[in-house]
A protein has these predicted regions:
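Conserved PLP-binding active-site segment in aminotransferase class I/II-type PLP enzymes
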Residues: 4-75, 79-84, 88, 109, ...
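Conserved SAM-binding loop
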Residues: 70, 95, 210
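PLP-dependent aminotransferase-like
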Residues: 83-172, 179
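Conserved active-site segment immediately N-terminal to the catalytic lysine
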Residues: 170-204
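Conserved small/polar residues in nucleotide/adenosyl-binding loops
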Residues: 1-5, 215-222
Length: 222
């Protein structure tokens, strides 16, 4: 970075987003002994400890989705979302070329073909007009990324998806708290994916959440 005709030669100071509240919360988990609720008995609260379940409930309530499923990373949440959409060999999934590799790697994981669609020069998100140019009879889903916290034109993307019976997976890793026409990001598609990675807006070191508003998709995901 140039400052008054000089070039900065030292790195910017490293920030620390871990405060007293976070430290207390971790200590409480260690003290209450509920490090896992994997007890070998099936129930609706089989996965995760009480605080994970609390996170899922509060996340779903805040972002106005039916279900929130906590995972170890947003990458895993993307993979689960593609699986819930029943993406498989011979399918095509439309993705943006301007994204993290996980958006494409998940498609390859299921033996499907990623098809790149151009971005909107104003938002750098998927262009609905460009999506229509790459549609084919094999198209199964669309992965739309809310790049830098800015959502794509979801009205138009939903119109295309409904016309062709496609699942929309919204990668909202960079966009918790954003809104599109009054609606929260992460709840704009059929499945939304959030990241809790250390470099994201809300973090726990590592983690991810899949937000689902369609019950039949959650059944596949879990």
């Amino acid at each position: 970075m140039c400052i008054r005709d000089s070039v900065r030669t030292t790195p910017f100071p490293r920030y620390n987003s871990i405060g007293i509240e976070e430290k207390r919360a971790v200590i409480e988990v260690l003290q209450d002994g509920y490090l896992s609720q994997f007890l070998g008995t099936w129930s609706k609260e089989f996965h995760g400890g009480p605080r994970v379940l609390k996170l899922e409930r509060e996340w779903a309530e805040y972002f106005e989705v039916n279900h929130a499923v906590a995972m170890n990373s947003a990458t895993s949440a993307l993979y689960a979302a593609l699986g819930a959409a029943k993406v498989g060999p011979a399918d095509e999934v439309i993705v943006t070329p301007y994204t993290m590799t996980a958006s494409v790697a998940g498609v390859l994981l299921y033996g499907a073909t990623p098809v790149f669609s151009d971005i909107d020069p104003e938002t750098y998100c998927l262009s609905a007009r460009a999506i229509e140019k790459v549609l084919s009879p094999r198209t199964k889903a669309i992965v739309a990324v809310d790049l830098f916290g800015h959502p794509a034109d979801f009205d138009e993307i939903f119109r295309i998806a409904q016309a062709h019976n496609l699942t929309i997976i919204e990668d909202a890793a960079q966009a918790p708290g954003g809104k599109y026409k009054g609606a929260w990001t992460g709840g704009l598609g059929h499945i939304g994916v959030f990241s809790l990675n250390y470099h994201k807006t809300i973090h726990c070191g590592e983690g991810g959440i899949a937000a689902v508003s369609y019950t039949h998709l959650r059944a596949h995901e879990t």
